[in-house]
């Protein structure tokens, strides 16, 4: 069976792998029918778009970066990641090999993309720079922080009477 699947892949056929979950015999494992939404995404990927980006490697950034103040508090923004997700999905549907570098996002990333999850602006910078030379196209749609706290406490900062001031440092642009 595996030899036949490998032959089909060799000839360019897309194989939808079985899903993981509860099987008919009560065991957990691979062998379930993939869910309908995933099957639909496979069909759309194969027939709905011209494959004008086949062979292209695309990196897309999405979402918000998170800059820690302490282990509990952080500075971020309201970016949902939807724009970056839409760009990544569209490039994938057009045949590109897509890497999505994502910060904090409101939803799950699109299927068929290589996902790299990051937290801070430095994490995102490092992830992009590490992959940049191997990409044909880079789309920067993330909402990256412009500043980070100068001092990050290793413990939760206790509430005190009066105001709290946080000195911020400018961050490098990606």
Protein language model regions, located:
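An anion/phosphate-binding loop that grips the pyrophosphate of nucleotide cofactors and donors
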Residues: 135
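Short glycine-rich anion-binding loops that position phosphate/pyrophosphate groups of nucleotides
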Residues: 21, 63-67, 142-150
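Short, glycine-/small-residue-rich phosphate/pyrophosphate-handling segment
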Residues: 1-19, 31-42
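Glycine-rich phosphate/diphosphate-binding loop of Rossmann-like nucleotide-binding domains
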Residues: 2, 6, 56-120
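General beta-strand structural signal in soluble alpha/beta enzymes
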Residues: 15-18, 100-101, 140-141
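Conserved small/polar residues in nucleotide/adenosyl-binding loops
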Residues: 172-174
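Mobile active-site "lid"/loop adjacent to the S-adenosyl-L-methionine
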Residues: 151-167
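Flexible loop/N-cap segments at domain edges
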Residues: 127-129
């Amino acid at each position: 069976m595996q030899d036949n699947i490998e032959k089909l892949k060799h000839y360019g056929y897309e194989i939808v792998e079985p899903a993981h979950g509860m099987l008919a015999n009560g065991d957990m494992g691979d062998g379930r029918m993939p869910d309908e939404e995933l099957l639909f995404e496979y069909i759309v990927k194969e027939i709905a778009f011209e494959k004008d980006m086949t062979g292209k490697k695309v990196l897309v950034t999405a979402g918000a970066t998170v800059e820690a103040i302490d282990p509990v508090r952080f500075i971020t923004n309201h970016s949902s990641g939807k724009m970056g997700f839409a760009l990544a999905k569209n490039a994938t549907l057009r045949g590109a090999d897509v890497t999505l570098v994502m910060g904090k996002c409101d939803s799950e990333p699109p299927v068929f993309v290589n996902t790299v999850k990051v937290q801070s602006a430095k994490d995102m910078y490092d992830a992009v720079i590490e992959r940049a030379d191997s990409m044909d196209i880079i789309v920067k749609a993330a909402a990256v922080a412009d500043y980070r706290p100068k001092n990050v406490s290793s413990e939760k900062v206790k509430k005190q009477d009066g105001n709290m001031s946080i000195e911020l440092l400018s961050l490098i642009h990606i």
